[in-house]
């Protein structure tokens, strides 16, 4: 039986998609060791030029090692054809065909099967296990109806559509019966869940919270305008993580307008302050170097960031994506300036995060942590605020949910003895 190795690039949604493919392998075995594999399946990411480059380099490397390489994911539409025509890939298949992976691997001839985004495909596979077992990523929707000027993802994932609530509940219930204690709700635009089905993410979360064995629910990312009063009521519940990732993308209205974003700084501030008042950690995304971000604009944006109650951030340098409105804008920012701004933001939020952790210690807030892995005599865990903890213990703690009352604040994480 031939062995298959999955190489997954990019987001949590891709991690779930890889599990869907793995679940559908009937005549092949999987391996976690790249060198053992006869077949390499690349689940690609195309969110930035850097992501494209990493995927391309890996595909070429595997082809040179005489591996049979198949290619799927968001990169199918941006570079799948080029890599296929140059002979690096045996086969290319879009998102619609993930569940046909077993048959595709048995094809003798080379093949290229693109996505048809008009058919609004949703997978039907039930994932029976997840790597790690204590935490699982659950895809609840696919696609995005936002039209942000810089973003290529709607053109490779299609318009927003939601999985049936019944299927999601069944999927989570199955995984929890096998030891999963925490789920992370993922998708292309998670907060749009239910819009096409007369529901919303808050109602889904309430129903998920009733599943036996599920102790904590995390949410991949939300847009500011997707957080309504019904969702805010959930902030009082113990089953919801005490960390929300809210995608602002910038903190200056001029840039939000240039990006064709739906949020604005005044309402963003009001929302974040409301959430922070419930003792929540808050993360966001931030794009530096988008066309139009002059020095004075960034200076004002940085001052706004300083005053926001943020604890986590995923900042990245603007990446020019072909055929997007932003790619036609001419008032670009130098890479040197973009890197300086990126580092300034990272440093700012690093200090905000440490201050937040110190405040929790001062308030005697116990950390509720799910222990994931053991390495070098220490256990690693994530607390309710999405902060890492290193735990020293002689006990078999893996997969345990702990309440840690005594801990130390270190530079980038907390330490505890249990």
From Swiss-Prot:
<feature type="binding site">
    <location>
        <position position="148"/>
    </location>
    <ligand>
        <name>[4Fe-4S] cluster 2</name>
    </ligand>
</feature>
<dbReference type="InterPro" id="IPR006638">
    <property type="entry name" value="Elp3/MiaA/NifB-like_rSAM"/>
</dbReference>
<dbReference type="Pfam" id="PF04055">
    <property type="entry name" value="Radical_SAM"/>
</dbReference>
<dbReference type="GO" id="GO:0035600">
    <property type="term" value="P:tRNA methylthiolation"/>
</dbReference>
<keyword id="KW-0949">S-adenosyl-L-methionine</keyword>
<protein>
    <recommendedName>
        <fullName>Putative methylthiotransferase HP_0285</fullName>
        <ecNumber>2.-.-.-</ecNumber>
    </recommendedName>
</protein>
<dbReference type="GO" id="GO:0046872">
    <property type="term" value="F:metal ion binding"/>
</dbReference>
<keyword id="KW-0411">Iron-sulfur</keyword>
<dbReference type="Pfam" id="PF00919">
    <property type="entry name" value="UPF0004"/>
</dbReference>
<dbReference type="GO" id="GO:0051539">
    <property type="term" value="F:4 iron, 4 sulfur cluster binding"/>
</dbReference>
<keyword id="KW-0808">Transferase</keyword>
<dbReference type="InterPro" id="IPR006467">
    <property type="entry name" value="MiaB-like_bact"/>
</dbReference>
<dbReference type="GO" id="GO:0035598">
    <property type="term" value="F:N6-threonylcarbomyladenosine methylthiotransferase activity"/>
</dbReference>
<dbReference type="InterPro" id="IPR020612">
    <property type="entry name" value="Methylthiotransferase_CS"/>
</dbReference>
<dbReference type="InterPro" id="IPR023404">
    <property type="entry name" value="rSAM_horseshoe"/>
</dbReference>
<keyword id="KW-0408">Iron</keyword>
<comment type="similarity">
    <text>Belongs to the methylthiotransferase family.</text>
</comment>
<feature type="binding site">
    <location>
        <position position="144"/>
    </location>
    <ligand>
        <name>[4Fe-4S] cluster 2</name>
    </ligand>
</feature>
<feature type="binding site">
    <location>
        <position position="11"/>
    </location>
    <ligand>
        <name>[4Fe-4S] cluster 1</name>
    </ligand>
</feature>
<dbReference type="InterPro" id="IPR005839">
    <property type="entry name" value="Methylthiotransferase"/>
</dbReference>
<feature type="binding site">
    <location>
        <position position="74"/>
    </location>
    <ligand>
        <name>[4Fe-4S] cluster 1</name>
    </ligand>
</feature>
<feature type="domain" description="MTTase N-terminal">
    <location>
        <begin position="2"/>
        <end position="110"/>
    </location>
</feature>
<feature type="binding site">
    <location>
        <position position="45"/>
    </location>
    <ligand>
        <name>[4Fe-4S] cluster 1</name>
    </ligand>
</feature>
<keyword id="KW-0004">4Fe-4S</keyword>
<feature type="domain" description="Radical SAM core">
    <location>
        <begin position="130"/>
        <end position="355"/>
    </location>
</feature>
<feature type="binding site">
    <location>
        <position position="151"/>
    </location>
    <ligand>
        <name>[4Fe-4S] cluster 2</name>
    </ligand>
</feature>
<dbReference type="InterPro" id="IPR038135">
    <property type="entry name" value="Methylthiotransferase_N_sf"/>
</dbReference>
<dbReference type="InterPro" id="IPR013848">
    <property type="entry name" value="Methylthiotransferase_N"/>
</dbReference>
<dbReference type="InterPro" id="IPR007197">
    <property type="entry name" value="rSAM"/>
</dbReference>
<keyword id="KW-0479">Metal-binding</keyword>
